Structures are given as structure tokens and as C-alpha cells.
């Protein structure tokens, strides 16, 4: 985040997927070795931590979801599929709202 702030960025976009947002398992990302502050967090907790970290540098955050699952691209054009129901999509957005929308620098969702 420091790099982004130093280069003049004032907003970043965090893409997510519904399946991972609904998971209660800790994230398993190879990049967490460098970002030790993300180790052991769930997917929603990871986004909250990243938004909080961005806030320290005055960076705004936009959350976007264009995938039902991590590998679902381009998909069939719907916001749900055989693995992720419409109810799951609503639950996922509910998690985003509950966990992240109170964070001052989360300014938009898509």
C-alpha cells in the first residue's frame, strides 16, 4: 500500500468471488508468505484487513464481484450458476456489507 500511495494512487479495486466469500476456511494463498498479516484469515477477514491497511495510506477501496467461483470466467453471463445459487449470491453480498461497508474507505461495490 505504501508503494501505491507514494505513486499517487488514491483508490484500488478488490475483485472477489462468491464461493470464497462464503467460505469460513482460512485463505491459502502463496502470497501470504510475504504478507504475513494475512495468514490464517478467512476470505472476508482478508478483505477487511486489506481495506484497513489501505485506509492507513488514505486509499479508497472498491469491491467488485464478477465471478461466482475462483475459476469461473467468463461464465454464462449470469450472477449465479449450478454451484452458486441466487441465495448464495445474496448471502455473499450480505457478508460484504456486514464485514466491509462500515470501513470508511470502502466507497463502492460492483
Predicted regions and their residues:
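Active-site mouth of glycoside hydrolases
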Residues: 1-110
Amino acid at each position: 500500500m505504501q508503494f501505491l500511495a507514494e505513486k499517487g494512487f488514491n483508490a484500488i479495486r478488490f475483485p472477489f468471488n462468491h464461493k470464497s466469500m462464503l467460505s469460513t476456511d482460512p485463505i491459502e494463498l502463496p502470497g501470504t508468505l510475504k504478507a504475513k498479516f494475512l495468514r490464517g484469515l478467512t476470505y472476508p477477514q482478508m478483505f477487511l484487513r486489506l481495506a484497513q491497511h489501505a485506509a492507513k495510506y488514505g486509499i479508497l477501496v472498491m469491491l467488485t464481484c464478477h465471478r461466482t467461483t475462483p475459476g469461473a470466467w467468463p461464465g454464462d453471463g449470469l450472477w449465479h450458476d449450478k454451484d452458486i445459487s441466487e441465495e448464495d449470491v445474496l448471502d455473499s453480498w450480505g457478508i460484504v456489507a456486514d464485514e466491509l461497508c462500515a470501513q470508511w474507505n470502502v466507497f463502492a461495490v460492483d
